[in-house]
Amino acid sequence: MENNSRTMPHIRRTTHIMKFAHRNSFDFHFFNAR
């Protein structure tokens, strides 16, 4: 886990945003895309 943070420090931020956006963004995009 520590190695991942050093290799990809932006992944930690992306994961947090993806989890948060996954609920709103993904749901909205999926509904609109359909």
Swiss-Prot record:
Binding residues annotated for L-ornithine, in chain numbering: R13
Miscellaneous notes: Changing the amino acid sequence by 2 frameshifts with minimal nucleotide changes indicates the peptide sequence, but not mRNA structure is important.
Induction pattern: Induced by ornithine; putrescine does not trigger ribosome stalling and so appears to repress expression. Part of the speFL-speF-potE operon.
Outcome of mutating F26A: Loss of ornithine-dependent translation arrest in vitro
Effect annotated for changing I11A: Loss of ornithine-dependent translation arrest in vitro
Protein name per the record: Leader peptide SpeFL
Keywords tagged on the record: Leader peptide, RNA-binding, rRNA-binding, Transcription, Transcription regulation, Translation regulation
Domain notes: An N-terminal sensor domain binds ornithine already present in the ribosomal exit tunnel; upon ornithine binding the downstream effector domain compacts in the exit tunnel, causing a shift of 23S rRNA U2585 which blocks the action of peptide chain release factor 1 (prfA), causing ribosome stalling.
Gene: speFL
Motif (Ornithine recognition loop): 10-16
Protein family (similarity comment): Belongs to the speF operon leader peptide family.
Record note on what altering F30A does: Loss of ornithine-dependent translation arrest in vitro
Renumbered residue ranges of the record's region Sensor domain: 1-13
Keyword rRNA-binding: yes
Complex and partners: Binds ornithine in stalled 70S ribosomes, blocking the upper two-thirds of the exit tunnel. Contacts 23S rRNA and ribosomal proteins L4 and L22.
GO MF annotation: an example: rRNA binding
A Gene Ontology biological process term: regulation of translational elongation
Known function: A small protein (arrest peptide) encoded upstream of inducible ornithine carboxylase gene (speF) that controls expression of downstream genes (speF and patE) by nascent chain-translational arrest and transcriptional attenuation. In the presence of ornithine a toeprint due to ribosomal arrest can be seen on the speFL transcript. Only L-ornithine (not other tested amino acids) has this effect. It is thought that in the presence of ornithine, ribosomal stalling on speFL prevents binding of Rho transcription termination factor to a downstream rut site allowing transcription of the operon.
